[in-house]
């Protein structure tokens, strides 16, 4: 699905970092280093970005037209 706007635990804004994070990780950078560079320090926010699975393209095939 879509990345949540805020961290579930602390409420910090994380959605603005998602595109930069995923682009750099797909380019081969270390995810921990990328999170450090983006300023994501709290482990709750880090797990939000590290554990997110983007499945919107798979789920959209199962929606019914309104």
Curated annotation (Swiss-Prot):
One of its GO terms (molecular function) is zinc ion binding. Its cofactor is Zn(2+). Gene3D superfamilies: Homeodomain-like. Keywords: Cytoplasm, DNA-directed RNA polymerase, Metal-binding, Nucleotidyltransferase, Transcription, Transferase, Zinc. It comes from the Archaea. The keyword Oxidoreductase does not apply. GO terms for cellular component: cytoplasm; DNA-directed RNA polymerase complex. It catalyses: RNA(n) + a ribonucleoside 5'-triphosphate = RNA(n+1) + diphosphate. Its EC number is 2.7.7.6. One of its GO terms (biological process) is DNA-templated transcription. InterPro entries: RNA_pol_su_RPB10, RNA_pol_suN_Zn-BS, RPABC5/Rpb10. Binds 1 zinc ion. PROSITE patterns: RNA_POL_N_8KD. Belongs to the archaeal Rpo10/eukaryotic RPB10 RNA polymerase subunit family. Part of the 13-subunit RNA polymerase complex. DNA-dependent RNA polymerase (RNAP) catalyzes the transcription of DNA into RNA using the four ribonucleoside triphosphates as substrates. This is DNA-directed RNA polymerase subunit Rpo10. It comes from Saccharolobus solfataricus (strain ATCC 35092 / DSM 1617 / JCM 11322 / P2). The gene is rpo10.
